[in-house]
Amino acid sequence: MIEERIPTNNYESVQGSITPSGFFGNSVDMIVELENFMTEEEQEFLFNFASNNTTWDYTISKKNENGTVIYDANIWEDRVATLHTLQKINPKVIDVVQKMFDRLKVKVDEFYNVDAMATSPAIVRWPVGTRQEPHADKELHEGPDAGKPNAFPYYDIASIFYINDDYEGGELYFPLQGIEFKPKARAAYFFPGDMNFIH
């Protein structure tokens, strides 16, 4: 199997954060699960795509003005396909995910009393042995740069769709809220992206 990489600047954006850190508080009640959000047809289509795709984004790491890494490309190498890549290899994925975004927006807007704007779609695979340390989606959460923007300052509210759950491990862990759970296949999850919700 030959894998292809498409150069992508998925962290370049003119859009900054629209909510300050802490805007949503730190309550566990701000972490939302929507079971069976994805249809069986969406699940099957996206699972088949993610299982068979061999073309992934190619990005480079980025540091802030203090030399702190705000995006580590090594973590995501050969396992993320974002808008630019999806447009080239299978635009139908974009359509399917956009319909899911549209349905989720209604729930997010209602829950947080906001007018959320979706970022572009991304398909992420987690091969055996991969993991990610607790982090905030929109900002750095530790060290001298804690609270400063990372490469995605516009990730005010994070949302994740889980295509499958037939694997060991993979728990979603929120250390500050003291909760850990295994995400369910076809479920959607959303929560604030600031350092009060490292995961």
Residue spans for each PLM region:
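Non-heme Fe(II)/2-oxoglutarate
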Residues: 2-111
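Catalytic core of non-heme Fe(II) oxygenases with the double-stranded beta-helix
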Residues: 94-199
